[in-house]
Structures are given as structure tokens and as C-alpha cells.
Amino acid sequence: MLRPRIIPVLLLQENGLVKTIQFGDERYIGDPLNAVRIFNEKEADELAVLDISASKKGKEPNYRLIERLANECRMPLCYGGGIKDLDQANRILSFGVEKIIVSSLAIENPKMISTMASYLGSQSVVVAIDFKKAMLSRRYEVMIHNGTKKTGKHLEDLVKEVIELGAGEIILNSIDRDGTMVGYEIEIIKKIQSICKIPITVLGGAGSLDHIKNLIQELGIIGVAAGSLFVYKGVHKAVLINYPNGTDKEALFP
């Protein structure tokens, strides 16, 4: 079994970092370069940076900022937001970013995912699927453009399609659990595990290291991501970048 990765997720809005609750209610939490330096010191396994302003507004990626983040980062860095074509993806990887993350592309131009996987290698292409519980249904619906647009596509169906397109990894991102810190969507994660033959990273809902421990030990998930857990501390959610030390991290694994 591969060693699980504990992955902080940082949300960019323009040049600053924010944290959201259910993809809204953005709260400014600081400078991205400073956050990267702190995660360097804490020896995070990997770091994911998602530019939600680029995703919402359909803007080009902020290449200057991405390059600065990549130069600062001493851990594997994944970037998502505004990536629509092969040239953009290739440029971002040329900065030293390890993986690019796409989301809306899986709905709006799925063939581009296959093209990226062919030219860049599947290991460099990650598809993030933002999902929420459908009204009056037990199924989960996929949303795009940072949760602002419905697709009518069910989560399980898109997962199968993304695998066939050649993506190397899927991020399951729960809109309902985002920023709530009440725990991950365990039942739907189990269901997706049963149909998914590529690595899964789970995001949305982590409020404690126990939530991460349960995901790793009960489900065998090898990619566990969190936002609020690693930028807030205490019941009043004071902004404080944090990450488990070596001893605490070892306790999460079987």
C-alpha cells in the first residue's frame, strides 16, 4: 500500500488566500507565499493551490504568482484554476509544479483531458470533481465554475468518464462539507472507491486529525486533503497555519 499523503489546500482569490464555507462566505486568511514557507517548515507531504477567482471568472492562470509559489515550495505542488488548454498546463508544469488540477474542463471540453494526459503523462493530470447532494434525491450532482453552475451530471457517472479520459487522479470535493469541519462524506466516498481504479484524494469537511485517521484506516484512502483544519486553530477559528508533526502524523496510519 502506498503511504497516505496529508495535503493542505490553499484557495487563492486574486493575490490573497481565502477560506470558504460551502464555496461561499470567503474569509481572507493571509499571504500565499508566507503560507507556503510555513508548510515548508512543517514538512507537509504535498500542497494544493486552487485559484477560485480564475475558476469563477474564466480568467487565465496567474502565471507570475504560480511561478513564485513554485520557486518557494519545497514539497510537491499541485495547481488548479483557469487551466483550459495544453499550452497553459505545460507552462505551469515548466515552473516546477508537479501536477495540474482541472475541474470544469471535464464537462466543457473532456477531450482536452485526454490530450493533456497523452502529452504530459497521466500522473500530471488531476481532475477535481465538485459535488453536492441533489435536491429531493439520494444522488450527488456535479457542479462547475466553483460551484456556481449545475451540470445535471451525477458524480458516479463523471468519475467513470474521467477514468476513461486518462486522468491520473481524482479529487472528490464536497461542496456541502466545505469549511464545515464536521467530517468527510464517508458513504459516497465508499461508493466511489468501489468503481474507481485510479488514486482518489478526498477534500471537504475535515475538522480534526481523527477525521483524517478514520478516512485512512477505515477506507484506505491515500490522498487526504483539508483546508480549514490546516489554517484555523481553536473554536473561534483564529487564523494559524498548522500541520501535524511527525509523531502525530504517524498515529494516523495503520
From Swiss-Prot:
- Enzymatic reactions: 5-[(5-phospho-1-deoxy-D-ribulos-1-ylimino)methylamino]-1-(5-phospho-beta-D-ribosyl)imidazole-4-carboxamide + L-glutamine = D-erythro-1-(imidazol-4-yl)glycerol 3-phosphate + 5-amino-1-(5-phospho-beta-D-ribosyl)imidazole-4-carboxamide + L-glutamate + H(+)
Q: Where in the cell is it found?
A: Cytoplasm
UniProt KW Cytoplasm keyword: yes
- What GO MF terms are annotated? imidazoleglycerol-phosphate synthase activity; lyase activity
* Pathway listed: Amino-acid biosynthesis; L-histidine biosynthesis; L-histidine from 5-phospho-alpha-D-ribose 1-diphosphate: step 5/9
Which SUPFAM superfamilies does the protein's record reference?
Ribulose-phoshate binding barrel
Q: Which UniProt keywords apply?
A: Amino-acid biosynthesis, Cytoplasm, Histidine biosynthesis, Lyase
The protein's assembly and partners: Heterodimer of HisH and HisF.
Q: Which NCBIfam families match?
A: AglZ_HisF2_fam
> Under which name does UniProt file this protein?
Putative imidazole glycerol phosphate synthase subunit HisF
Question: Can you name the source organism?
Answer: Leptospira borgpetersenii
